[in-house]
Amino acid sequence: MIIRALPLIALFVLINFSLGYAQKIFQADSPDEASVRVFAVEEPEQADLWVCFVWEESEITRTGLWMDMRFSREADVIIYFVDEEKDANLKIWLVDTIEESKWINDAKKSLLQIKSPEK
């Protein structure tokens, strides 16, 4: 039974990653190095995205699940956490479980879209 499900699981993962939304992040040392400036809000209704940090690459199954990478070259997106909400272009609420992660403000999805390499 599990062997039959493997192609479906592989297809699901492939489709999910082909949607082009970054999940591997690197935290820059300065805002000039980042493509997205992030602010962690104090209330969930203030957020654009509810984020859950994961520890294993295999856990990255959808948007809102972020894995903090050690090196910028490993990341899909480089972020910088700002101190003031007004300086952010993405506001996040940190959640405890994978199931809670989700977009609240769909208009902000393009901030985490992976750009296709130019030919």
Where are these regions (language model features)?
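Repetitive, compositionally biased segments used for assembly/scaffolding
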Residues: 21-119
